[in-house]
A protein has these predicted regions:
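Long, domain-scale functional regions
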Residues: 1-242
Length: 242
């Protein structure tokens, strides 16, 4: 085997300029840092989460032309597998319409549905994986039109999310998260109390008899998925700035 000898005289030298692009900070890092100076629009809650507050803070963000608002940076969000990281929580700026949280036949809770988010009709409308549902199934997630539940006793209406559904850019950013669905003991209390009870062990099955209490659905206090609703504590903390 012949090996070519390295000849040092074959080397050439030249001048060049190297440019390094500074990597921008993560949104969560940017907001957390901004909160140290912008105390009019941002505040850290009792549990270390950084939140936008006040009547109309500049917390808008756009994805593919859709406008959302940043609720804040939530600490140590579990992705459902035990991995935890800080996450930015956003809410759509405009309503997508009026649809049932859940509904049912009149024989079940007098047609009012069941207050269990993990099985709710609205959850199945918003999230992926429910395409087999004949009404509402993943229409919002898939940017499709069809029929959605709109009132009690399984009433339906036509719905169209071809322009308002989740766009691909945002889909690629949405990860699973553990949502806390613990029930509150009252409708009126401070935000920190709501926050604690959302993460508590009390579920939404608070009745034992009557026409509005006939379902046999097991209640849970957590749910893992991509799209949920604003917590009562989110609203309470957001309005704390006026």
């Amino acid at each position: 085997v012949n090996y070519q000898k390295y000849n040092a005289t074959n080397n050439t030298r030249t001048k060049c300029d190297l440019y390094f692009k500074v990597k921008p900070p993560m949104v969560s890092e940017y907001i957390t840092t901004l909160a140290q100076t912008d105390t009019a629009n941002l505040a850290v809650d009792d549990y270390g989460n950084t939140r936008y507050i006040g009547k109309n803070p500049n917390n808008f963000v756009s994805f593919d032309g859709d406008i959302w608002r940043i609720i804040g940076v939530m600490k140590n969000v579990d992705d459902g597998t035990g991995n935890k990281e800080d996450r930015v929580k956003i809410i759509r700026s405009e309503s997508i319409g009026y649809y049932s949280w859940d509904t049912s036949e009149s024989s079940v809770n007098n047609g009012r549905g069941v207050n269990e988010w993990s099985q709710a009709d609205l959850m199945k409308l918003l999230n992926p994986g429910y395409e087999s549902e004949s009404v509402g199934g993943s229409l919002y997630w898939n940017n499709k039109s069809g029929t959605c539940y709109s009132d009690y006793k399984n009433q339906t209406t036509s719905c169209n999310f071809t322009s308002t559904g989740i766009k691909d850019k945002l889909k690629n950013m949405l990860g699973n998260a553990v949502w806390n669905t613990g029930a509150s003991t009252t409708y009126s209390q401070i935000a920190s109390k709501f926050y604690t009870e959302e993460r508590g062990t009390r579920n939404g099955k608070i009745c034992t008899s009557g026409t509005y209490c006939t379902d046999a659905v097991a209640r849970t206090t957590t749910w893992t998925g991509k799209i949920g609703l604003m917590y009562p504590s989110d609203y309470g903390y957001a309005t704390s700035g006026g």
